[in-house]
Amino acid sequence: MARVALVTGGTRGIGAAISRALKAAGYNVAANYGSSDEAAAKFKAETGINVYKWDVSSFDACAAGVKKVEAELGPIDILVNNAGITRDTQLHRMKPEQWTEVINTNLGSLFNMCRNVIEGMRERKFGRIINISSINGQKGQFGQTNYSAAKAGEIGFTKALAQEGARVGITVNAICPGYIATDMVKAMPQEVLQKNILPQIPIGRLGEPEEIARCVVFLAADDAGLFTGATLSANGGQYYA
């Protein structure tokens, strides 16, 4: 029977690529989303992947979402925490809600999701948790104190939970993408991309969502049990942690 994989933020951008790649690798995939019903319905129609809507910043919503996924598909063995938002501005202009929204969605969601799957994983003595952090959680970024703090927190969370899960067959790893060719990044002015961003990347190009997805498929595999507590930098050489 195929293992069940749940991807938060799994219907757009990097998350959509992850959902598609896991399905292609033979997993029974559930893709969480939190915003556009129309976009999620289109994704489901194109891929055949089941979609589930809930707010990952709410513990109760995550509990209900996990319960529904497991009732319909079976126990969740692979969790990919990919959902995230930005509310960029310099700290001296940042409103409290811009801080809390990013922290609660990007970092709080890891507790909300992991807490609701970890007991089942421990009972079954198997689990793969993969957290999508960011290069900006490693190096920081101007105008992103909230986002950088949350993404750095994801790395710390990963290392701590990896120690707790190691003896019961649960691996926990983080992936830190750099600039990836999502719709959001590709919408940037070409002049900004060509003059300000690409020169910082030694390989001279943006990453592709599918490249991150392939990393996830590897870390999710049954035979990837040696890898836990790791932070995989996928940034084309832009930053070395």
What is the predicted role of each segment?
Residues 90-91, 98-103, 129, 185, ...:
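Substrate-binding pocket helix/loop in short-chain dehydrogenase/reductase
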Residues 114, 150, 158:
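Active-site helix of classical SDR
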Residues 134:
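Residue(s) in the substrate-gating loop at a strand-loop-helix junction
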